[in-house]
Structures are given as C-alpha cells and as structure tokens.
C-alpha cells in the first residue's frame, strides 16, 4: 500500500472533504479487481467476547463509517470487527461546517460533527448489502432535536430496526457534540435508560430468537466516583460490554497547537493516556463481570498492548488509522 503518498495528498484538503473523497474511492473499487490495492493478509487471532467470536481483537471505531457505506472495504483491510454509526432514528445534517480539524503535530483530531447521518433505515439497507463476514457493531444515538428527557425513545426506535442485523449494539451516551447527551451517563437517567434498553433487548431476543449483546460507550472526562457509579449501573443491569472511551473535552492536552481552541471532542494520541487510565479503573470496578472494548489514541502496537494490559478484551482505532493508514491494522494484529 502507498498510504504515505495518499495521506500527503489528502492532508492538503479540508479534513471532511478528504473523508468524502476517500469514501467515494473506496466504494468505487470495492468488489472490483482494484480492491487488491486495499486488501491485506492478516493473521487470524480469534477472540471470544460478549458471547461473539471475533476474527481478531482489532476493530474500527464508530464515527468513521457513520452510514455503513464502506463495510466491505474496511473488512478487506483486515479489521476483526467493524462498528458503524453513530446512527439516529431520522437523518440529520449535524453541526455547521467546518466541524473537523486535524491537530497534525499531536496526531489528534477535534470534531464537532453532531451525529450527521442518513438515518437508521439507510444504514440497515447498507448492512444488508454488505458481504463482510466479521462482526458488525452498530452504534446508536438520539436525534439532536429530541429532548434529552425523551432520549431513550430514540435508542429504542433504533434497536427495533437494527436488532436482526447487528452483531452487537453500542449505546452512545458520551458524545460531547449533542447537547445534554452526556447527562445520560449519570444516576437515575442512566438507570432509567439501561432498564429500558434491557427490556427492549429481551423483547427482541424473543422475537428474533437471537441474543444481540449491548455495550455502552463512555467518556474519558469522568471522575473516579462517576466511574464507580457507572460500573455499578452496568453490572446491575447486566449490560454486555463497555466501550472506553469517547473523545475528551480537555484541550490542555494540545494547548498552543493549531486549532486547539476549536469546540468539539479531541481524539487521537492526546487522549491515549487518559483513555488507558479510564480502562484500568473501569476494569477494577467491573471485576471481570463485563468485558471492555478499549479505544482512544491507539496509534502503535505498543499503545494497543497498553490498552489490553489495562483490561481491554478488544480494541478499536480511528484517529490512529487516519494518521497511519491500513498498515497499522497489520502491525497490531500480526504482532499483538
């Protein structure tokens, strides 16, 4: 692969334009002889987690393929699982542009995308068309114009539609770019949401005779006490997995760098240490009762190993993939 050359060209463009251009090309070559240029031979390293069998422990994090447009392309690159979304019940445009910024010196990204997506029905059609044989996770959220007190209704609508097509479902309550969303991580609001989610999961299990695990994605900007409370809620409600972590609002990590004052969530290398520490603390509180999918700043084999040593059973990449390309998948999976 010639990703360094492609990256040089893409990084001359606005980040969102570069993303759209890349996706157009991936869709164009998938299923043709030109797929050879993205296909990689990856070691098979099966992992069982949440009752599912994964080809290898490295997945694509949610947010890159929001609508499930390029599932087969990412599968060809060697991901052991692919998480698509965040998707909402209705299509929405997201926040105003520009809304995505590269912090190149720190290999970070700041985004305030705002759950831009074409809606859950469109995503389901894309999943049905995909030929990828690995686990597909579907990450769900609420529409921006849905009041937060009615947010759980949006999650239940999405669950109804995606359940028969999902390998697992991720409840995203930790994006900083949807007003009020992170309040669902705490106290009664979290318990109320998780209770409704588990009831819906039980109904759908009976309907489809299939158990689809549910994971909850949390933020890195949590105190130790908040992590303890979240872990307790996850255990009490028999949630199947925890994904740690989403992006951070702490911009001190990139102070003085270009775009460091932009609003939105910071991802990539700057969040690496904090994410790993959250995984370590969460692992201690969950006491092996619930597996953790570790994400946040994984940009090397060493960073991947640190996440697993901290307590992650599976890991995901996003920003590291943008900066290092498909070779990062091969480096991690073949040597982990």
UniProtKB/Swiss-Prot annotation:
SUPFAM superfamilies reported for this sequence: FMN-linked oxidoreductases (SSF51395)
Source species: Photorhabdus laumondii subsp. laumondii (strain DSM 15139 / CIP 105565 / TT01)
Protein keywords: Cell membrane, Flavoprotein, FMN, Membrane, Oxidoreductase, Pyrimidine biosynthesis
Biological process annotations from GO: 'de novo' pyrimidine nucleobase biosynthetic process; 'de novo' UMP biosynthetic process
Enzyme class, spelled out: oxidoreductase
GO cellular component labels: cytoplasm; plasma membrane
Domain of life, source organism: Bacteria
Residues that coordinate or bind substrate: 66, 111-115, 172, 177, 246-247
Protein name according to UniProt: Dihydroorotate dehydrogenase (quinone)
Ligand binding (FMN): 62-66, 86, 139, 172, 217, 245, 268, 297, 318-319
EC number(s) reported in the record: 1.3.5.2
Known role: Catalyzes the conversion of dihydroorotate to orotate with quinone as electron acceptor.
Subunit structure: Monomer.
Alphabetized HAMAP family for the sequence: DHO_dh_type2
Pfam families (alphabetical): DHO_dh
Cofactor(s) recorded in Swiss-Prot or TrEMBL: FMN
Catalytic reactions on record: (S)-dihydroorotate + a quinone = orotate + a quinol
Subcellular location: Cell membrane
Catalytic site: 175 (nucleophile)
Co-factor note (free text): Binds 1 FMN per subunit.
InterPro entries in the record: Aldolase_TIM, DHO_dehydrogenase, Dihydroorotate_DH_1_2, Dihydroorotate_DH_2, Dihydroorotate_DH_cat, Dihydroorotate_DH_CS
CDD domains in the cross-refs: DHOD_2_like
PROSITE patterns: DHODEHASE_1, DHODEHASE_2
Keyword Flavoprotein: yes
Family: Belongs to the dihydroorotate dehydrogenase family. Type 2 subfamily.
């Amino acid at each position: 692969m010639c990703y360094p050359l492609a990256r040089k060209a893409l990084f001359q463009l606005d980040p969102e334009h570069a993303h759209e251009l890349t996706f157009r090309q991936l869709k164009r070559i998938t299923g043709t002889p030109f797929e050879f240029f993205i296909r990689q031979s990856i070691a098979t390293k099966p992992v069982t987690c949440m009752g599912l069998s994964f080809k290898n422990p490295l997945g694509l994090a949610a947010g890159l393929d929001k609508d499930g447009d390029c599932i087969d392309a990412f599968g060809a690159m060697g991901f052991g699982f692919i998480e698509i979304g965040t998707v909402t019940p209705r299509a929405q445009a997201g926040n105003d542009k520009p809304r995505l910024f590269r912090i190149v010196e720190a290999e970070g990204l700041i985004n305030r995308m705002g759950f831009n997506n074409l809606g859950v029905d469109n995503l389901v059609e894309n999943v049905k068309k995909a030929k990828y044989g690995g686990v597909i996770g579907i990450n769900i959220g609420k529409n921006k114009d849905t009041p937060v007190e009615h947010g759980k209704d949006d999650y239940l609508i999405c669950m109804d539609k995606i359940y028969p097509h999902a390998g697992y479902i991720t409840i995203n309550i930790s994006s900083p770019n949807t007003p009020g969303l992170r309040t669902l991580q705490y106290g009664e609001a979290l318990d109320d949401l998780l209770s409704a989610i588990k009831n819906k999961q039980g109904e759908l299990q009976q309907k489809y005779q299939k158990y689809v695990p549910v994971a909850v994605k949390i933020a890195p900007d949590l105190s130790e006490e908040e992590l303890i409370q979240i872990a307790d809620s996850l255990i009490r409600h028999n949630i199947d997995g925890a994904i740690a972590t989403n992006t951070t609002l702490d911009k001190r990590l990139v102070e003085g760098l270009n775009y460091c004052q932009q609003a939105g969530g910071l991802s990539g290398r700057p969040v690496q240490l904090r994410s790993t520490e959250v995984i370590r603390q969460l692992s201690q509180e969950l006491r092996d009762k619930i597996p953790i999918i570790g994400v946040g700043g994984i940009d090397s084999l060493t960073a991947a190993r640190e996440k697993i040593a901290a307590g992650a059973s599976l890991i995901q990449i996003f920003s590291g993939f943008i900066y290092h390309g498909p070779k990062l998948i091969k480096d991690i999976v073949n040597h982990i």
